[in-house]
Amino acid sequence: MRTAAAPAPIYTSRLFPAPRPRATDPTAPTWELLEHLGLVGRTDAAGVHTLLPLGLRVRDQLDRITRDAFEHHGFNSVSLPTLQSRTLWEESGRWKVYTAEGALITTRVGGTDMCLAPTSEEMAVATVRPHLRSHRDLPVRLALNTTKFRDETSPRGGLMRGREFTMADAYTFDANRAGMLESIGLLNRACTDALTGIGLHGVVQAPADGGAISAGPTTEHLVLADFGQSSILACDYCGHRGDGAILSATFPATSPPGEPVVNVIVFAVTGPDGTTRPTAVCIRSDLTISTRKLAATLGPGHHLELLDPEDLPGLLGKSAGTLTPWDCTRIDVVHDHSVSGLDRFTIADGPEDLRTGASWAGATGLPPLDLHPADVHTAADGLDCGRCPAGRYRATEAVEVAHVFELGTQYSAKMSLTFTGDDGTPRTPLMGCSGIGLTRCIQTLAGVHRDAEGLRWKHGTGPADVHLVVLRSDLTEQQERTDRTVQQLHHLGLRLIVDDRPLPAGEKFRYAQALGVPTALVLSPRHADGELEAVDRWTGRRSPITSDHLHTLRRTAS
């Protein structure tokens, strides 16, 4: 971490909100602990929070550390607008996708449809487009930290899943696939360095589903934690791991004991030519469909949505929940591997009834069916590994703190971004991008490192580097010693919290422990002039230190 000018010290006597006198509940959820200690606050809107002074200090540190990490790897820092036009998003085709999902926050400005963007691929292309002429202008690698918005359907978990959040993003543009893969490597390394720099160690990387951002390969950076709102699957034998939406399971060649139930789910699939037609998916009832795999099975350029249940009776003569594979012979059908190998299974035979003994080869009253097997299931905990014959997938709770996406020409081609190649012909650059959830990282850091006494921050990431606990701050001599010590520590570039409140020592110590700044310095009238006591929040070790040796704290904090 580079040495930088420290911000002005925070004095608890002037801090908003004032530190609460009552003790923290060590069993409280991390979000409540952050709120109790005055780092974050609630608003009247779900998924929207305030960062109070101490929380803002944390966010600013994470912002600086992540920006440094990307600049170290050759990225140029920029600031892109969050307010973006509908026209721009229609160029990429995502206006319809995101509004259909209900994820886009839209508004009108000056008679123009706009959105508060949840991501900035379109704006990155629009920013590069006027300046890209030749292959000599590539690669372009941009980094930005910005506030984003998403109309999250179920905001929860405090800062973990909100409607307004800060991201550290990066976008890359390259002349060819080899260059793009080099940039993807840089994105992953920059994310790793940034996450390590903010104090998240042991972050796991795993292949993942790119969702509405990318149809190409992606990599999640995950912190394994029991408070995570995501999960990662890993084989308990070979270690093969990833997001369930892209992993494949294997299924027995014959039906397991007890007949599985086969569900039928119908999608409206729009092809590259704009024509929409229904497609049914047959899948085991205890599994979910991976829309990423289904789209890949149908081929490039297909967009799929669940068919409106009200359209089913007119199309197939049955309502949702009563469809069987035999009702879908007039439309396209995909049979997931979870059911294509079954010799016997159960199907719906009415809203409340099930029919056993069905078979793809036919059964009483049912003709044989042609199968179109495909891998379209989402792998789940307990399923057999698709990579090795001996293991099963086990799910672990995790927090997704970063994501790297291989975009290819997904945006650049649609938005007519071109350059002149070395042979003089027009070319389309290949893109990559990444995102680190800075707001989410605040709560993740707090949750990972907290103990029974409260929060614990790694050096350089919390609201301060040093918590100066001034005992008997009402004494004139103590006030003078405080001023000298603060001046010295600030000159050393250390970020400070100064507890100068006229309170008993015990209350100040409890507050310092709960807030979790890595080093507390105790300034007591019992100490000789120039002498203090240092308390390490992580080890609890107390040791004397003189004012002549305060510079050692700078080495510790870096």
List the predicted regions and their residue ranges:
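Charged, low-complexity intrinsically disordered tails and linkers
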Residues: 2-38, 122-155, 438, 448-452
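TRNA-binding/sensing appendages of the translation machinery
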Residues: 2-109, 172-211, 287
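Extended, low-hydrophobicity, polar/charged segments
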Residues: 42, 121-129, 154-168, 175-434, ...
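Short acidic loop-to-helix transition motifs that present clustered carboxylates
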Residues: 85-88, 311-314, 500-507
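C-terminal, non-catalytic macromolecule-binding modules
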Residues: 432-462
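Generic long, charged, amphipathic alpha-helical segments
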Residues: 454-508
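C-terminal structured "cap/appendage" subdomains that terminate the fold
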Residues: 485-552
